[in-house]
């Protein structure tokens, strides 16, 4: 099955989207320190996908971005204290109502700059969650790692700045949950966002615990071959 790209959708304005924002505010108000906002990185050039808009690539019947957003709502319904969701993406990527948008200025500054932009947008809302999750749209099942990361970070207390997925070989800093203030300091030291900076260089300064994570959660889709394999249900 061949994946389809550049799907456009109107902004959604249904009651479900409104109730999602209400649920985010309730989750944060209940215990702001342990509530988690989530930043989904959905920018970039899509170079290995022939320039396609990666969040709009369709596989298994949904855009890659929508797999992540739907998964987050599933976790919310299961009781994980999720706050607001902010997608770092250009204006042409359609987002559901209730999902915030951010974009580094100028665009294409790299994921570290994208995280800083997302934190800036989330920080304008009140109340503000104490934790911030980082996911990427090209890992459509990455949301499955969040409950274990949340448990690890909350149980550890202030001695840890974050908890990240580990794929058996590497710590995946872009699949992680962090204390908001520590993350903000790492990506925007002195309040100035870093640009074109390696993720490991910026986030590697934080005190994080690597949590073993299932293969499906860390699997990212960077090429058409990987998209087609995942779309068809093949392991590779």
Q: What are the language-model segments listed below?
A:
Residues 2-51:
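N-terminal nucleotide-binding beta1-loop-alpha1 segment
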Residues 1-2, 236:
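Short, intrinsically disordered, low-complexity terminal/loop segments
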Residues 31-196, 201-217, 224-225:
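Nucleotide and nucleotide-moiety/phosphate-recognizing core
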Residues 10-16, 77, 85, 181, ...:
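Positively charged, low-complexity intrinsically disordered regions
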Residues 14-20, 59, 184, 233:
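Intrinsically disordered, low-complexity segments enriched in polar/charged small residues
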Residues 218-236:
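Short, basic/aromatic-enriched C-terminal tail that caps enzymatic domains
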């Amino acid at each position: 099955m061949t994946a389809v790209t550049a799907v456009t959708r109107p902004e959604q304005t249904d009651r479900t989207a409104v109730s999602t924002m209400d649920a985010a505010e309730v989750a944060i108000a209940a215990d702001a320190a342990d509530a988690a906002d989530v930043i989904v990185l959905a920018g970039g050039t899509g170079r290995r996908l022939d320039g396609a808009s990666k969040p709009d690539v369709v596989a298994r019947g949904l855009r890659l971005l929508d797999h992540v957003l739907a998964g987050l709502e599933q976790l919310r319904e299961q009781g994980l204290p999720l706050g607001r969701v902010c997608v770092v993406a250009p204006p042409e990527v359609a987002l559901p109502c209730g999902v915030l948008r951010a974009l580094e200025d100028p665009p294409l500054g790299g994921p570290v700059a994208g995280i800083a932009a997302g934190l800036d947008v989330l920080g304008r809302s009140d109340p503000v969650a104490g934790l911030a999750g980082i996911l990427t749209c090209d890992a459509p099942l990455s949301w499955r790692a969040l409950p274990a990361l949340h448990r690890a970070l909350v149980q550890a207390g202030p001695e840890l700045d974050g908890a990240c997925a580990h794929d058996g070989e590497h710590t995946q800093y872009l699949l992680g949950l962090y204390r908001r203030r520590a993350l903000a300091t790492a990506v925007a030291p002195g309040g100035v966002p870093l640009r074109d900076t390696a993720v490991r260089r910026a986030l590697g300064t934080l005190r994080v615990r690597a949590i073993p994570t299932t293969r499906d959660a860390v699997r990212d889709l960077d090429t058409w071959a990987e998209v087609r394999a995942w779309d068809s249900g093949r392991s590779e």
